[in-house]
Amino acid sequence: MALSQYTSLSTELVLATAIFCIVFWVARALRTQVPKGLKTPPGPWGLPILGHVLTLGKNPHLSLTKLSKQYGDVLQIRIGSTPVVVLSGLDTIRQALVRQGDDFKGRPDLYSFTLITNGKSMTFNPDCGPVWAARRRLAQDALKSFSIASDPTSASSCYLEDHVIKEANHLVSKLQKLTAEVGHFEPVNQVVESVANVIGAMCFGKNFPRKSEEMLRIVKGSSDFVENVSSGNAVDFFPILRYLPNPDLKRFKNFNDNFVLFLQKTVQEHYQDFNKNSIQDITGALFKHSENSKDSGGLIPQEKIVNIVNDLFGAGFDTVTTAITLSILLLVTWPNVQRKIHKELDTVIGRDRQPRLSDRLQLPYMEAFILELYRYTSFVPFTIPHSTTRDTSLNGFYIPKDRCIFINQWQVNHDEKQWKDPFVFRPERFLTDNDTVINKTLSEKVMLFGLGKRRCIGEIPAKWEVFLFLAILLQQLEFSVPPGTKVDLTPTYGLTMKPQTCKYIQAWPRFSK
């Protein structure tokens, strides 16, 4: 046998041995000691090195829903060499996040999370101890005080209502003007400005200058943000990708750096005018708490205020923008639904006054539409990933401490065991008593904001804001597209899934003022 052949054979043997050793090492690393009476969550075989990253594809929520039908509500995959437990099914998720909430309240230590407010984000930080819990309560109280709490200086029922009415009326005028002058518009670029001004007013007591550089940077950067913190982002599980050319990751880093600088500047400017006897917004409330507690070793030093404001801004911004944009697309796709909402608004409110938050209970079809929007689109397909805080079990399966957990909200909202015709858009499914009352039991099955100890702190203000924006828009406007225009509702995957761009939306006045 020639020397070259021996050399080739030797090389192949070395390569085969190396591959075997790598596979053996990975398998050994992944193997955990399962307590007696419990089982390891089932799942498909993955590829060496890659795991199931190819299985997830471009739409992980759909791929994992399909796997749940085969392996059940508790299954395990690998992304790279990292094991991930995927939870589906409403009962299973409630058991984990509510009844066993302390076991599943952690956050995995993912690379993308470390880039958000320098790794100090209350929402994305792995910390879930007493200090985190206290700051979360403080953030909730501040958000409640300057959103859903009553405003003694205004005729509106609360601060949120006052801000939304102003911005919604401005949006109505702007959409009418664009339709009259241009003939059509792209909704998200119009909606996002109004929503940003609402959350800006609640956080800082002021609106952002319209079309300013800061506003445009926030709008552009928000899409980069949601793309990079979605469940299954490869950069979190394959460290080498952090060092290779990655335009998406670069934009994500730049957005976070710039947004923190923007918040630091805005918070510092706010502090110059701070008057603890006249608190008008969330940041002022946080300043007051910091001032009152600094002598007693308080829970929130001033340098943490930027981090909390960042989380609150995010909680009230992207979700609301996406919900309103999707609503407009759904209404032009199902014009009969829009007509029913118009009829309800005309009957209950009329045209002599504007809708208020207090009208919600009297507008069941509007509420049913919003619930079906959340369920049908499931535009937050997964919660932000969780992790286990200790060794635990679920449905007879052993889940060790620090295991990354994906919560598949999209599966819950399209589960054929829970919903009749889950892929049909039908707001009436939520109505009872001759379509006059919301079915509370069914409405509580819709998942969009998570559950348990990590439930989105902005859920209630976000729901109120979506309702009031839509009620004011639909009282005054009729949305349509030119004949023959097709609206594509296929979403692009991310932390929040975005609809395809549609530049041909029209908004026509329903009556003369």
Curated annotation (Swiss-Prot):
<feature type="glycosylation site" description="O-linked (GlcNAc) serine">
    <location>
        <position position="68"/>
    </location>
</feature>
<keyword id="KW-0456">Lyase</keyword>
<keyword id="KW-0492">Microsome</keyword>
<keyword id="KW-0472">Membrane</keyword>
<protein>
    <recommendedName>
        <fullName>Cytochrome P450 1A2</fullName>
        <ecNumber>1.14.14.1</ecNumber>
        <ecNumber>4.2.1.152</ecNumber>
    </recommendedName>
</protein>
<dbReference type="GO" id="GO:0106256">
    <property type="term" value="F:hydroperoxy icosatetraenoate dehydratase activity"/>
</dbReference>
<keyword id="KW-0560">Oxidoreductase</keyword>
<dbReference type="InterPro" id="IPR008066">
    <property type="entry name" value="Cyt_P450_E_grp-I_CYP1"/>
</dbReference>
<dbReference type="InterPro" id="IPR002401">
    <property type="entry name" value="Cyt_P450_E_grp-I"/>
</dbReference>
<dbReference type="GO" id="GO:0008203">
    <property type="term" value="P:cholesterol metabolic process"/>
</dbReference>
<keyword id="KW-0443">Lipid metabolism</keyword>
<dbReference type="GO" id="GO:0042572">
    <property type="term" value="P:retinol metabolic process"/>
</dbReference>
<comment type="function">
    <text>A cytochrome P450 monooxygenase involved in the metabolism of various endogenous substrates, including fatty acids, steroid hormones and vitamins. Mechanistically, uses molecular oxygen inserting one oxygen atom into a substrate, and reducing the second into a water molecule, with two electrons provided by NADPH via cytochrome P450 reductase (NADPH--hemoprotein reductase). Catalyzes the hydroxylation of carbon-hydrogen bonds. Exhibits high catalytic activity for the formation of hydroxyestrogens from estrone (E1) and 17beta-estradiol (E2), namely 2-hydroxy E1 and E2.</text>
</comment>
<comment type="pathway">
    <text>Cofactor metabolism; retinol metabolism.</text>
</comment>
<dbReference type="InterPro" id="IPR001128">
    <property type="entry name" value="Cyt_P450"/>
</dbReference>
<keyword id="KW-0349">Heme</keyword>
<dbReference type="GO" id="GO:0101020">
    <property type="term" value="F:estrogen 16-alpha-hydroxylase activity"/>
</dbReference>
<dbReference type="InterPro" id="IPR036396">
    <property type="entry name" value="Cyt_P450_sf"/>
</dbReference>
<keyword id="KW-0276">Fatty acid metabolism</keyword>
<comment type="pathway">
    <text>Steroid metabolism; cholesterol metabolism.</text>
</comment>
<dbReference type="GO" id="GO:0005506">
    <property type="term" value="F:iron ion binding"/>
</dbReference>
<dbReference type="InterPro" id="IPR017972">
    <property type="entry name" value="Cyt_P450_CS"/>
</dbReference>
<dbReference type="Pfam" id="PF00067">
    <property type="entry name" value="p450"/>
</dbReference>
<keyword id="KW-0753">Steroid metabolism</keyword>
<dbReference type="GO" id="GO:0042448">
    <property type="term" value="P:progesterone metabolic process"/>
</dbReference>
<feature type="binding site">
    <location>
        <position position="225"/>
    </location>
    <ligand>
        <name>substrate</name>
    </ligand>
</feature>
<dbReference type="GO" id="GO:0008210">
    <property type="term" value="P:estrogen metabolic process"/>
</dbReference>
<keyword id="KW-0408">Iron</keyword>
<comment type="similarity">
    <text>Belongs to the cytochrome P450 family.</text>
</comment>
<comment type="subunit">
    <text>Interacts with PGRMC1; the interaction requires PGRMC1 homodimerization.</text>
</comment>
<dbReference type="GO" id="GO:0004508">
    <property type="term" value="F:steroid 17-alpha-monooxygenase activity"/>
</dbReference>
<dbReference type="GO" id="GO:0020037">
    <property type="term" value="F:heme binding"/>
</dbReference>
<keyword id="KW-0479">Metal-binding</keyword>
<keyword id="KW-0325">Glycoprotein</keyword>
<keyword id="KW-0256">Endoplasmic reticulum</keyword>
<keyword id="KW-0503">Monooxygenase</keyword>
<dbReference type="GO" id="GO:0101021">
    <property type="term" value="F:estrogen 2-hydroxylase activity"/>
</dbReference>
<dbReference type="GO" id="GO:0005789">
    <property type="term" value="C:endoplasmic reticulum membrane"/>
</dbReference>
<feature type="binding site" description="axial binding residue">
    <location>
        <position position="456"/>
    </location>
    <ligand>
        <name>heme</name>
    </ligand>
</feature>
<keyword id="KW-1207">Sterol metabolism</keyword>
<dbReference type="GO" id="GO:0019369">
    <property type="term" value="P:arachidonate metabolic process"/>
</dbReference>
<dbReference type="GO" id="GO:0042446">
    <property type="term" value="P:hormone biosynthetic process"/>
</dbReference>
